[in-house]
Regions:
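Intrinsic disorder in cytosolic terminal tails and internal cytosolic loops
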Residues: 1-19, 408-424
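Helix-loop boundary and gating motifs at the non-cytosolic
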Residues: 10-71, 227, 231-278
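Hydrophobic core of transmembrane alpha-helices in multi-pass small-molecule transporters
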Residues: 34, 115-133, 243, 312, ...
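Transmembrane alpha-helix termini and helix-breaking/packing motifs in multi-pass membrane transporters
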Residues: 48-55, 106-112, 169-189, 262-263, ...
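Loop-to-transmembrane helix entry/capping segments in MFS-fold secondary transporters
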Residues: 58-59, 149-159, 268-269, 353-362
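C-terminal transmembrane bundle of multi-pass solute transporters/carriers
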Residues: 74, 78, 85, 91, ...
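Cytoplasmic helix-loop-helix junction between adjacent transmembrane helices
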Residues: 123-165
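Helix-loop junctions on the cytosolic side of multi-pass membrane transporters
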Residues: 140, 144, 183, 187-217, ...
Length: 424
């Protein structure tokens, strides 16, 4: 039931880290995603390389990334309302089928040499719309397949580790496939990979969840969800922390090529080293969070991780030495993934089940939707005060928000304990 059985490591350690695997439905979900996410990263690399090969334009590369992310800002909140109304598993199946269709269309256009940059941007935008709709359903679906609330943090952390593993595996595989068979077949392979998660979802046995009848329009339900999150102090504190960390903390990733080339005097290999260091820290953080048995420790972990993220980022911003930059990024990656995953766990653990989809959509909006806006602001400011000082200034905002959250963490802990005592 648990991976890595037979290795010379204490079995109870793996039992703790992979305890969400005791749920049959979660195992299916995890294995299906593992194949699909690698395919997604293969497609991401191939799409970027295809645009670069056709145009050589950094601006158009940025436009592709913007097209993938910006729909979240407008669609995700409304998708969260529907996630509280509709069957989450069925909707996820539909979004995976739509993503599969986009991949196959990309493959056909590329293999027949009909592809243009405008088509790539349009299909990236379609993919972004599907992703924006899919995210609240996907995130609020995990508690549906995890019976015990105390195992929820483990399931969310394992999902994060899977994402980071795919980020490690997918790009190198994509690079090899581009060299061997070209971008078109990379898109085709990604389309096929979606079959894994579709089959996994179809194979699950889930008890029908009775949802209370909904009255009023989507807008009124959205307003109710926003009001609920705002007046629930613990959720308001958590979402505010995530919003500030996303807007001011995450844009540094878009500026990494400039750090590699202009600050450290490197090339694409240096960028790979920096990205790998960030990913190594993130992967370590995901497994660290998965190993935590007591969910009551998560509020304190969230606070310490947000401080670690801000401090690591500030050191990286001012570093002119490769070794120090790599070390700072490992710390930053660890703090980043533990910070965002632990706040996600807390939000899902303390929110009422009938409002979880809408609350998770607000988390997704602050985590994904506003980051492109922060990146635009960071790029504009960097033109005047330099990239390092921009990132350093942004890291100080993250540090201040973490310190302020520290004054509210007891409220979050109390909400969690109360929810654990009363149940769903």
């Amino acid at each position: 039931m648990y991976p890595f059985r037979g290795l010379p490591v204490r079995f109870d350690t793996f039992h703790t880290i992979f305890r969400a695997f005791q749920y049959r439905n979660y195992r299916y979900y995890y294995y299906g995603q593992s194949i699909s996410l690698i395919g997604v990263w293969v497609q991401n690399i191939a799409m970027g390389w295809l645009v670069y090969r056709l145009t050589g334009s950094a601006l158009l590369l940025g436009t592709i990334a913007f097209s993938l992310q910006i729909p979240s800002l407008f669609i995700t909140p409304f998708a969260g309302v529907l996630a509280d109304r509709w069957d989450r598993r069925k909707v996820i199946v539909v979004t995976q089928i739509l993503s599969m269709v986009v991949a196959f269309v990309l493959a056909w256009l590329t293999l027949t040499e009909r592809i243009t940059v405008g088509m790539i941007i349009s299909l990236a935008l379609v993919n972004g719309v599907v992703l924006a709709f899919d995210t609240p359903f996907r995130q609020s679906f995990v508690p549906d397949i995890i019976t015990r609330r105390e195992d929820l943090s483990n399931a969310i952390a394992l999902n994060s580790s899977l994402y980071n593993l795919a980020r490690f595996i997918g790009p190198p595989v994509g690079g090899v496939l581009i060299a061997l068979v070209g971008e078109g077949w990379c898109f085709f392979i990604n389309g096929v990979s979606f079959a894994a998660v579709i089959i996994a979802l179809a194979s699950m046995r889930i008890k029908k969840i009775r949802r209370p009848p909904r009255f009023g329009s989507v807008f009124s339900q959205l307003r109710e969800g926003v009001g609920y999150a705002w007046h629930f102090r613990s959720i308001r504190y958590l979402i505010t922390l995530v919003a500030l960390s996303s807007f001011f903390g995450l844009p540094f990733q878009a500026l990494m090529p400039l750090f590699a080339a202009e600050i450290l005097g490197g090339d694409s290999q240096m960028l790979g080293i920096l990205t790998g260091a960030l990913g190594a820290g993130a992967l370590t953080g995901a497994f660290f969070l998965a190993s935590r048995k007591n969910i009551r420790s998560i509020p304190g972990i969230a606070l310490r991780a947000s401080l670690m993220f801000a401090l690591g980022l500030s050191v990286f911003a001012l570093s002119a030495y490769t070794a120090l930059s790599v070390l700072a990024l490992v710390v930053t990656g660890f703090g980043m993934i533990v910070h965002f995953n632990s706040t996600n766990t807390l939000i899902q653990s303390i929110a009422d089940d009938d409002k979880r989809g809408r609350v998770v959509s607000l988390y997704s909006l602050t985590f994904m939707g506003i980051t492109p806006l922060g990146s635009l602001l960071a790029g504009a400011i960097a033109e005047y005060i330099s990239v390092p000082f921009t990132v350093f200034a942004f890291s100080l905002v993250c540090l201040a928000s973490a310190i302020l959250f520290g004054k509210r963490v007891k409220t979050v802990y109390t909400s969690l304990v109360r929810k654990m005592a009363t149940g769903p």
